[in-house]
Amino acid sequence: MRKQSKIIFYAGIVLGFAAVLTGVALSGGRKIPKDFTVSYDGIKTADITAGVSVHDPSVIEVDGTYYIFGSHMSGASSEDLRNWTSIGDGYTQSNPIFDDLLGTEHVFDYTGSRDSVIPTDDGTYHVWAPDVVYNRAQDLYYMYFCTSSTWNASNLCYAVSDKPEGPYTWKGALIYSGFAKDTIEATDVLDYVDISYAKKNYIIAGNKYNYEKYPNAIDPTVFYDADGKMWMVYGSWSGGIFLLEIDEKTGLVIHPKEDEKNGVDPYFGKRLLDGGHKSIEGPYILYDEESGYYYLFVSYGSLTREGGYQMRVFRSKTVDGEYVDMNGAYPGMWDDNAAYGLKLSGNYYLPGLNKAYMATGHNSAFVDEDGKKYIVYHTRFDNGQEYHEPRVHQYFLNQDGWPCMLPYATDGETIAESGYDISEVAGTYYVINQGTAISARIAQPVKLVLMENGNVYGENLEGIWSMEQGTCYMTITYGEKEYNGVFCQMKDEAGTDVMTFSAVGANESVWGVKYFE
């Protein structure tokens, strides 16, 4: 991305020169703060509500209306990305999102119900993690989703509608997983590989599915690449995240030729990340024209409130990888994946909230018609329950092209692209760094003071910060790490105006919130 000339506010670096360049008199004379006690006195708190509960929300915008679709046959619409109205929910034949999915023949033949070849582990219906995409060639909306019975036995399917809200009519199955010798005949696997290949690769000793190497066929996302080709990324735990091309004219998958050297399987496609049955799921790929990168979002941890659920992101210049993190690395099959991927959000508390957000994850993302970029995810709360709601945050790319997610749910904020006055951004911030751990720990704010002379002070730490001339870009360095991001004025979730920053470095995200005096 294009670099801007840097105006440096670092302590001890020719501050008079910086003042001439900016036309701002840098004080540098303020006393060094000594009290770093975190207090929320005088800060209004509130709960916002989306009005709906949609798990694993996948977003699509059509003519100014935003639609999200989630697990358990749920969906909602919104005009402002904040207030949502349900358009369907639950396993009923009358659910308007589908054209009688529960009564359609063959939908649950293999998985997803108590009567399937592989019955559901709890005897109920399982319809999970849909994704809706507009098929340009057919002028139709395609929903890709899964029916699932166990932690590795699943079936990717698709349905079609002429309207984004549905109803969607089931058209067929695409990919099967979790099969063994006695159930493979109920799949289409042998249409693409012979039985000897299947036994050698997919089925291991004890007549079990080779789940550590091959995927669980759930969590699909379908997208267009820079050249107009359609692709589907999918997978959860098990053998990791896989990629298959989609035939735009039919909506069906294109099975590739085997290429073992490059991780391409003739049935499941190309492995992009992970394997070894580690926590990674909910893949979502978005191509960004501004940076020229494909961004692969995934979630780590367990989706329960205290499961450490969190959002990560990798990127690549090509659609089929390699997808790498800020360190230029990616997790292999047997690596501890906590160290890999830029962590965008996990468990955190910020001022203005009545309760902490927990298990933020399984996100989608999009670039709106006005160029604003958004991340859509579900969150649980620090309230002892598993209730969840969708949230939408605006994000920006820093000067290195990495996503920086704003701290609070979007409320129509617009960043000052020409930057802010130093008096607006200097001051006392509530700062959280969620690190890279996968745990139930809730990140709590610490107090950092950004001085006008470029120094940073906190409890037992010192650092420096800087701004970029005529832009919103900023850098903060403390604890021997550098974080690059943006300043943005917005509202906290109680409606109070705040200055915020969001910056990333070393696969960590740092958020800061300053209240105006």
Language-model region placement:
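N-terminal Sec-pathway targeting helices
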Residues: 1-15
